[in-house]
Swiss-Prot record:
Keyword Flavoprotein appears in the UniProt entry: yes
Lineage: Bacteria, Bacillati, Actinomycetota, Actinomycetes, Mycobacteriales
Pfam families noted in UniProt: Pyr_redox_2
Gene Ontology terms for molecular function: oxidoreductase activity
Induction, per UniProt: A member of the dormancy regulon. Induced in response to reduced oxygen tension (hypoxia), low levels of nitric oxide (NO) and carbon monoxide (CO). It is hoped that this regulon will give insight into the latent, or dormant phase of infection.
The protein, known as: NADH dehydrogenase-like protein Rv1812c
Species in which this protein is naturally found: Mycobacterium tuberculosis (strain ATCC 25618 / H37Rv)
Taxonomy, superkingdom: Bacteria
């Protein structure tokens, strides 16, 4: 039997698998002719971009609910090796699987430098499990002795994830530490750049800065973290901040599986792909999502985001089947780019274009953000094969 293996079950991986199933259906390929298999380290599709939120109950979807109706198999295991010449992947269980075509969609991870104490005492919202660990830690602190340090959270990294996390935390902390005792919850956002939101551009920066003020979030810019301890952080300036919680949100890098391939990678560890999501220099392999640097237009590469990961997955899934059956491949181009950043109780900010010009803010932008987070980025959850395959069509959604 011919086999397509998809590594990863995030935004790109899920949609690559469903996209492949859809194209097989469209070509009327007989059942049992091509096996589409997802291999990932968990039996869930996680809505990773919501990990900063207080309520995580809707952030994890059983893969069986969305892959099963589409006839896609799933293996729960960590892929440890890719043999591109032999067309075989090996997992942490010792099992190996041959493939005729591979879609690499193993995502990215937060970069944690070898700082004293970070591995032992730091938290993150990079994964669902990490977000749950942070949530349980904060709940534990709220049930213990109430001190200023217990009610203080330091967030490191003032990019998009760091800003959303910092803006969400004041409300969570006030709810957790509501018994008072004269202790005021405190959130401090740290970044080595001279200002917060360095990637958001000049138009959005004043909106972000005002939102941080409105949320009561303190900032320390132009400094870095030198060390982390159970009681707080020491900054490069020499300042020490007493805090029982340090959340690391600084920097992302593509999955380490990309390092096993004999081709160049960009500064984020991503593979270069062509317009059809084929990995340049590696036969029979496609890549989508955070592991791939794909051209969105003549000037801009894809961004590590679900905004780009989902359509990259859909196109990769369609093209991997087209490639198997000598059908024309579809080029991916996305003619627009937006950013919708959650600012907690201060609303949100919505920007358009690669220069990130603000077009909406406050409550209207918040409504858009909530619509994205709770509806737009979800697969159909009604168990309908027809709905799942229809949603996996190789197309680019209009702006939210």
């Amino acid at each position: 039997m011919t086999r397509v293996v998809v590594i990863g079950s995030g935004f790109a991986g899920l949609w690559a698998a469903l996209g492949a199933a859809r194209r097989l259906d469209e070509l009327a390929v007989l059942a049992g002719t091509v096996d589409v298999m997802v291999v990932s380290n968990k039996p869930f599709h996680d809505i990773r971009v919501r990990n900063y939120e207080a309520d995580l109950s809707a952030c994890r979807i059983p893969l069986g609910d969305v892959l099963g109706p589409a006839g896609v198999a799933h293996v729960t295991a960590e892929v440890t090796a890719i043999d591109a010449d032999g067309r075989r992947v090996t997992t942490s269980t010792g099992a190996s699987y041959s493939y005729d075509r591979l879609v690499l969609a193993s995502g990215s991870h937060v970069v944690k430098p070898a700082l004293p104490g970070l591995a032992e005492f730091g938290f993150d919202v990079d994964t669902y499990d990490g977000a749950v660990r942070l949530q349980q830690h904060l709940q534990g602190l709220a049930g213990g002795p109430l001190t200023s340090a217990a009610a203080t959270v330091v967030v490191v990294g003032a990019g998009l994830t760091g800003i959303e996390t910092a803006c969400e935390l004041p409300g969570r902390l006030h709810a957790l530490f509501a018994r008072g005792d004269g202790v005021t919850p405190r959130v401090v956002l740290i970044d080595h750049n001279p200002f917060v939101g360095s990637d958001m551009g000049l138009s959005a920066r004043p909106v972000i800065e005002q939102a941080l003020l409105d949320n009561g979030v303190e900032t320390r810019t132009g400094v870095s973290v030198a060390a982390v301890s159970p009681g707080g952080v020491t900054l490069s300036s020499g300042e020490r901040l007493a805090a029982a919680t340090v959340v690391w949100c600084a920097g992302m890098r593509a999955s380490r599986l990309t390092e096993q391939l004999p081709v160049a990678r960009d500064r984020l560890g991503r593979l270069q792909v062509d317009d059809y999501l084929r990995v340049i220099g590696v036969p029979a392999m496609f890549a989508a999502g955070d592991v791939a640097a794909a051209r969105m237009d003549d000037e801009h590469l894809s961004v590590m985001s679900c905004q780009h990961g989902r359509p990259m997955g859909r196109y990769a899934g369609c093209n991997v089947i087209n490639d198997l059956f000598d059908q024309p491949l579809l080029a991916l181009r996305i003619p627009w780019y937006v950013t919708v950043l959650d600012l907690g109780s201060a609303g949100a900010v919505y920007t358009e274009g690669w220069e990130r010009k603000v077009v909406s803010q406050g409550a209207p932008a918040k409504t858009t953000k909530q619509s994205i987070n709770t509806r737009r980025i979800y697969p159909p959850l009604n168990g309908s094969r027809a709905d799942l395959l229809a949603a996996a069509a190789p197309r680019v959604q209009p702006r939210p």
